[in-house]
């Protein structure tokens, strides 16, 4: 166990250096909730009973961090996640969600505020534990300015943190490294509570081989460590691809370690 780890028989926890939150090392991504045929036969809808069961199982086994977004599961992830989690005491889980105003028609302050306030309604909460600017770097500096800077939304989110409606403010990163570096350069002013990056054994030094827009996690993590900003990891298995090795790679690994 490293510094800040609390081993238990079910889960390892990390204590946030900024808030003291005791967060499970394994979080639950709510981007792909199970679906079932729609009652009217037109497409699919979220299987709420299945979601409830998955959330119950996760909490029973020590998971207490749930990551969602207004953009996930055709816009219905937050509602399904809120229904499932609201059946548990509020102090038993942390909710992470995002201001996912990707489309230019949601860049206005009014549209962004509607999205932000809707998250509270859908999640059935009066505060959000971890709020992220979603996917900064996608669209470069122009998108960052349109989504968060020119409309005053970053300043608004900082004030919401001061008011206690946001407990931790951070961002998730894909794409243009200029945007990542710019936001970190403002850390002394903004005081980022955490940053979410893509990190796994491929992306550590070979990120561009899986996606040319990405930057090696070694650099991303290093920049956070230099500033003492806690990191949250997404895609530890590269969207599941690292859990399904092809026969050639399995053979090579077995040559190295037959056991």
Feature locations, PLM:
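Active-site mouth loops of central-metabolism enzymes
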Residues: 31-49, 98-111, 142-145, 175, ...
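Structural motif corresponding to the early beta-alpha repeats
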Residues: 88-109, 113, 134-137
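Structural preference for beta-strand elements that scaffold enzyme active sites
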Residues: 15, 23-27, 64-65, 92-96, ...
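Active-site groove signature of glycoside hydrolases
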Residues: 120-145
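Beta/alpha (TIM)-barrel catalytic core signal, keyed to glycine-rich beta->alpha loops juxtaposed to Asp/Glu
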Residues: 10, 136-259
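Short amphipathic alpha-helices and their capping/turn segments at secondary-structure boundaries
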Residues: 9-21, 82-86, 112-123, 180-187, ...
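Short, acidic/polar
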Residues: 42-58, 107-124, 175-186
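N-terminal binding-site loop/beta-alpha segment at the start of enzyme catalytic domains
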Residues: 1-93, 126, 151, 156, ...
């Amino acid at each position: 166990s490293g510094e800040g780890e609390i081993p238990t028989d079910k889960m390892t926890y990390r204590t946030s250096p900024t808030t003291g939150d005791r967060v499970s090392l394994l979080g639950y991504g709510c981007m792909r909730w199970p679906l079932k045929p729609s009652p009217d036969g037109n497409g699919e809808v979220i299987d709420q009973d299945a979601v409830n069961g998955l959330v119950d199982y996760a909490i029973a086994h020590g998971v207490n961090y749930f990551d969602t977004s207004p953009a996930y599961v055709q816009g219905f992830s937050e509602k399904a996640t809120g229904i499932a989690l609201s059946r548990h005491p509020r102090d038993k889980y942390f909710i992470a969600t995002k201001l996912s105003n990707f489309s230019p028609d949601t860049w206005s302050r009014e549209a962004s505020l509607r999205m932000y306030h809707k998250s509270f309604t859908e999640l059935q909460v009066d505060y959000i534990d971890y709020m992220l600017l979603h996917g900064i770097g996608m669209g470069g500096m122009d998108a960052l300015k349109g989504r968060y800077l020119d409309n005053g939304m970053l300043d608004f989110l900082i004030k919401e943190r001061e008011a206690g409606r946001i407990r931790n403010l951070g961002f998730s990163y894909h794409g243009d490294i200029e945007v990542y570096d710019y936001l970190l350069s403002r850390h002394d002013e903004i005081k980022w509570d955490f940053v979410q990056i893509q990190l796994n054994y491929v992306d550590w030094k070979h990120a561009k081989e899986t996606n040319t827009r990405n930057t090696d996690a070694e650099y991303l993590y290093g920049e956070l460590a230099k500033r003492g900003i806690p990191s949250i990891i997404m895609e530890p298995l590269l969207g599941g691809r690292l859990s399904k090795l092809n026969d050639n790679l399995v053979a090579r690994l077995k040559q190295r370690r037959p056991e």
